[in-house]
């Protein structure tokens, strides 16, 4: 007789059976998959013992290949071999063509302006290409673990915006994977090192991969990982080192700038090989397109020094955001294959005043951290005391009257988080409100980034200031934002999930935080002026309504005094003198006090008409 299998609701029927989870580092140049086995996190290798999977896909009419096989076709079939697709994720076609004008692919724009790559397999978008890489990694994990994955944690750069994060999730779904969560790459590295060393204090995670740079300042204390600040550049990485060196080799060899794609690929391959060799050797011989020459490490360092300096400027900004000095940082974790470049390690060590940590393979550390987190989230370590707190990189807020930005969630707030603020109507009888969601650090709308707009309709027709609208911002663990606006008395609401069609540009990423510091004093003055102008408009709007309703309560002389005060306020409100506007508002208030008192008395008399004192 078979036994009846009983389990608690929501739990596995076999509660002690280990669930299969993996951490995936979906990188620009290379990707990895890792898992926890026998209590140890490890990356999984292919049949030839290779842990890295080149993030390259080669498409043909009858199928595609991923990884090393695809990379060998890069020089032979450039148009159908897609590499560094992570850089294209969440970007518009116009943005890609401006940012990467020399890509060997042919693009078409979809109806909404997103890029479609022409291949032998048809038109493909970056999400589909990323999904094919994820499928290859998942297949490696499934084979190694002898079972289907119950869930994965996928890492993304800390500076990925909502569109890029959503694109990563969409790619995972297309690959048939259940995403437990997205995890910032520097945070994943902190998990790996934090568990291994148990170090407490402030740690900097310097992550220089193939296509992105991230710097995170974290505090580790008693198993708690708190991200104090983040910074970086979503379009700076080792690929840029490669292209600079390739351009240098092309100039030395006298190869035309607009040579065919095959030669361009040969140049890039030669540059990559030279870069790797120069990590150990002081010079290297390069052979390309019939040219042979010598390149020294000193020449390479001179080429990349400006890019390394850019990363250190981002480090300085992140430290300032965190309120931490460089000498307070206990350890510096190096992440990403590009941190093997000697100049990078040297300059980072000089900046922080200590040698950086490289005890965990910088190519593998992110995947290892993701695997540890996946093992916890899938339920294999339910008693884990580790707490992970990510942050949002830029403030989120709303546009208010006068073109001002009201910050609802400040930057570097830990996520997930939900914050709400109450707003009200500006005009009498206002029945709708436009909600404009902003991102950035400046005080004025014109200096911040627009994320989304939506409207709340069905607001009760009440006097100005009578309706109360609560706007709630909610950022989930993956950094995706949803905004809800609700009118309190009726419960009517509207909401939106913010998924911009493409990401921040280089200049926006680099300058938004910097500008907020450079223009801080100017912005405060501009905000004060805008606030006074809004208050002046509100006072005049209210006064005009009152005069239209109860002008009979005033004598001709009294009306003239009020009209003169209002005209003066209207005139000075067109200027830029904050004090003059403030004094004019006070003057209108002073000249209308008796009028306001008479209106109040009249309202009371009307309310009491027909009622006895006892009834009241």
Swiss-Prot record:
- A biological process term (GO) from this entry: iron-sulfur cluster assembly
| A Pfam family this chain is assigned to | HSP70
* Keyword set includes Nucleotidyltransferase: no
The UniProt record lists the keyword Chaperone: yes
Q: Which domain of life is it from?
A: Bacteria
Recorded hits in InterPro entries, A to Z, give: ATPase_NBD, Heat_shock_70_CS, HscA_NBD, HSP70_C_sf, HSP70_peptide-bd_sf, Hsp_70_fam, ISC_FeS_clus_asmbl_HscA
Sorted alphabetically, the keyword list is: ATP-binding, Chaperone, Nucleotide-binding
Q: What does this protein do?
A: Chaperone involved in the maturation of iron-sulfur cluster-containing proteins. Has a low intrinsic ATPase activity which is markedly stimulated by HscB. Involved in the maturation of IscU.
Q: What is this protein called?
A: Chaperone protein HscA
């Amino acid at each position: 007789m078979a036994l009846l299998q009983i389990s608690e609701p929501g739990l596995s029927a076999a509660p002690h059976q280990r669930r299969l989870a993996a951490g995936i580092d979906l990188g620009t140049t290379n990707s990895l998959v890792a898992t926890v086995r026998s209590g140890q996190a490890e990356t999984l290798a292919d049949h030839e013992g290779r842990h890295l999977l080149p993030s390259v896909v080669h498409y043909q009419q009858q199928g595609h290949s991923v990884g090393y096989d695809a990379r060998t076709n890069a020089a032979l079939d450039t148009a159908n071999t897609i590499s560094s697709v992570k850089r294209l994720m969440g970007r518009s076609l116009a943005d890609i063509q401006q940012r990467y004008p020399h890509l060997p692919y042919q693009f078409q724009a979809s109806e909404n302006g997103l890029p479609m790559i022409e291949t032998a397999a048809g038109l493909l978008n970056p999400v589909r290409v990323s999904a094919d890489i994820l499928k290859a990694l998942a297949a490696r994990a499934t084979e190694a673990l002898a079972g289907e994955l119950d869930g994965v944690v996928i890492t993304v750069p800390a500076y990925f915006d909502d569109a890029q994060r959503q694109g990563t999730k969409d790619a995972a779904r297309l690959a048939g994977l259940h995403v437990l969560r997205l995890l910032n790459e520097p945070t994943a590295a902190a998990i790996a090192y934090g568990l291994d060393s148990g170090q407490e204090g402030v740690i900097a995670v310097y992550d220089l991969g193939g296509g992105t740079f991230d710097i995170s300042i974290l505090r580790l204390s008693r198993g708690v990982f708190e991200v104090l600040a983040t910074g970086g550049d979503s379009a700076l990485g080792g690929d840029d080192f490669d292209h600079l060196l390739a351009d240098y080799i092309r100039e030395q060899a006298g190869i035309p700038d607009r040579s065919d794609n095959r030669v361009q690929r040969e140049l890039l391959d030669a540059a990559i090989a030279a870069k790797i060799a120069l990590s150990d050797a002081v010079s290297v011989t390069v052979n390309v397109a019939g040219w042979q020459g010598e390149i020294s490490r000193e020449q390479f360092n001179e080429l990349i020094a400006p890019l390394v300096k850019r990363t250190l400027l981002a480090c300085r900004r992140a430290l300032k955001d965190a309120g931490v000095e460089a000498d307070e940082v206990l350890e510096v974790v190096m992440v990403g294959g590009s941190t093997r470049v000697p100049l990078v390690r040297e300059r980072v060590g000089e900046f922080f005043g200590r040698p950086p940590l490289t005890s965990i393979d910088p190519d593998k550390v992110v995947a290892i951290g993701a695997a540890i987190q996946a093992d916890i989230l899938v339920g294999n370590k339910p008693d884990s005391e580790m707490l992970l707190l990510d942050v949002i990189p830029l403030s989120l807020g709303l546009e208010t009257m006068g073109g001002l930005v009201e910050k609802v969630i400040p930057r570097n707030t830990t996520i997930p988080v939900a914050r709400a603020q109450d707003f009200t109507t500006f005009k009498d009888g206002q029945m709708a409100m436009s909600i404009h969601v902003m991102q950035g650090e400046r005080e004025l709308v014109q200096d911040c980034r627009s994320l989304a707009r939506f409207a709340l309709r069905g607001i009760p027709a009440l006097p100005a200031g009578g309706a109360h609208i609560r706007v709630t911002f909610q950022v989930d663990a993956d950094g995706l934002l949803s905004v809800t606006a609700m009118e309190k008395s009726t419960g009517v609401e509207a909401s939106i999930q913010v998924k911009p069609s493409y990401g921040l540009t280089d200049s926006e990423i680099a300058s938004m935080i910097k500008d907020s510091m450079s223009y801080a004093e100017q912005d405060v003055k501009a905000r004060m002026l805008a606030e006074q102008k809004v208050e002046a408009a509100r006072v005049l709007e209210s006064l005009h309504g009152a005069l239209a309703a109860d002008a009979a309560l005033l004598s001709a002389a009294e009306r003239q005094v009020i009209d003169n005060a209002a005209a003066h306020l209207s005139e000075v409100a067109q200027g830029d003198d904050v004090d003059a506007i403030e004094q004019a508002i006070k003057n209108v208030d002073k000249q209308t006090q008796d009028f306001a008192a008479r209106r109040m008395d009249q309202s009371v008399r009307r309310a009491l008409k027909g009622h006895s004192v006892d009834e009241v």
